[in-house]
């Protein structure tokens, strides 16, 4: 199966503007997050790769795995360096400092430019990349700014779903994009593998907190006819995903829109939380129960305490500080 992932991009002039409003809107300026940088948290991005030539990456060290070619050094195969944009939101060290700049980061190249302005991948390669994040990198969080279309079965057990289920059942957090087919073209389902119950499916919001027009709708009915239950209604959350400034190749910067960007905001928030609450990290023989607690805290952290779920807005918009506050009130996860 061929996956196509398309986001909106706009090259910005130097010196580039900043999108600090987005981090503020998502609750990253909350006092409860003071001093947290993601240190000691292992994050694995599966994307188009990364181009470290942007000066904002000076001093950044990553682990790189190439599922497309045989490069031993970091490379970005994507249209407009999609993976580089996503990584910059996390670990850029200058101009617009990333939201979790001290994480231990791995980037796996599994998507590439199809020559028509889209990034494509074979689902089997994406699944292999996720498996590498699990078995070789020992990730705490796997960040997937990508996705594929669900079949009529809606919970299709393709390779990406299977390996995502493997990850979350081991207590590894998977944050995945809900998809960019919102509006008239919406098929009413979030992308694969964000449809997996314990994965966190992320939609996009605008400046001001409204649902971005192309953010995908979720269905709450499983293939067997059963209904999803809290805290796993899809999508779970929205986060800023419109006109987000981040790193490109060389000294370029881009404005990007889509659920890809929104996914990274949730990944960053979760990295800060796991630094603060290391008992919530995956452990030997973890069974996913910590994820259940963290996702319930995410639901409760939204406006209204997650009492209402919307098929596009989820439980509401991310507020990183509120999420951490909810988790601090939980008992330790064993």
Which stretches of residues belong to each language-model region?
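Solvent-exposed loop/turn segments at secondary-structure junctions
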Residues: 49-52, 67-69, 111-114, 147-151, ...
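Subtilisin-like serine protease catalytic core
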Residues: 32-43, 50-63, 74-122, 137-140, ...
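Extracellular S/T/G-rich loop segment that most often corresponds to the catalytic His/Ser-adjacent loop
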Residues: 47, 191-275
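N-terminal domain-start motif of subtilase-like serine proteases
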Residues: 5-44, 68-79, 212-215, 219-223, ...
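Hydrolase catalytic cores
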Residues: 108-112, 241-311
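Secreted peptidase-domain scaffold signal
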Residues: 179, 320-334
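Substrate-binding/access-modulating region of protease and related hydrolase catalytic domains
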Residues: 111-198, 232, 247-264, 309-312, ...
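Structured segments of extracytoplasmic/periplasmic soluble domains
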Residues: 34, 89-93, 129-136, 145, ...
């Amino acid at each position: 199966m061929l996956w196509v992932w398309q986001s909106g991009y706009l090259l910005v002039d130097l010196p580039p503007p900043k999108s600090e409003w987005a981090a503020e809107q998502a609750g990253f300026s909350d006092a409860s997050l003071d001093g947290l940088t993601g240190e000691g948290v292992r994050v694995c991005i599966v994307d188009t790769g990364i181009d470290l030539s942007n000066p904002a990456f000076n001093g950044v060290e990553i682990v790189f795995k190439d599922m497309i070619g045989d490069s031993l050094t970091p490379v970005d195969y994507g249209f407009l360096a999609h993976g580089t944009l996503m990584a910059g939101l996390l670990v850029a060290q200058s101009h617009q400092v990333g939201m979790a700049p001290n994480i231990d980061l791995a980037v796996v190249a599994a998507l590439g430019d199809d020559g028509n302005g889209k990034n494509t991948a074979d689902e089997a390669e994406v699944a292999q990349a996720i498996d590498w994040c699990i078995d070789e990198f020992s990730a705490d969080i796997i960040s997937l700014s990508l996705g594929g279309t669900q079949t009529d079965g809606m919970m299709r057990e393709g390779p990406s779903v299977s390996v995502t289920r493997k990850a979350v059942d081991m207590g590894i957090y998977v944050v995945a994009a809900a998809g960019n087919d919102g509006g008239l073209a919406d098929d009413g389902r979030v992308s694969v593998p964000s449809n997996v119950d314990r994965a966190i499916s992320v939609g996009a919001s605008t400046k001001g907190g409204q649902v971005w027009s192309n953010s995908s709708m979720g269905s709450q009915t499983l293939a067997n006819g059963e209904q999803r239950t809290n805290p796993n209604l899809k999508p779970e959350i929205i986060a800023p995903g419109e006109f987000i400034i981040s790193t490109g190749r060389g000294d370029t910067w881009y404005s990007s829109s889509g659920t890809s960007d929104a996914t990274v905001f949730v990944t960053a928030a979760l990295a800060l939380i796991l630094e603060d609450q290391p008992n919530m990290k995956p452990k030997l023989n973890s069974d996913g129960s910590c994820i259940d607690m963290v996702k319930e805290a995410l639901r409760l952290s939204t406006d209204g305490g997650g009492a209402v779920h919307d098929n596009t807005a989820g439980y509401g918009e991310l507020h990183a500080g509120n999420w951490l506050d909810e988790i601090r009130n939980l008992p330790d996860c064993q």
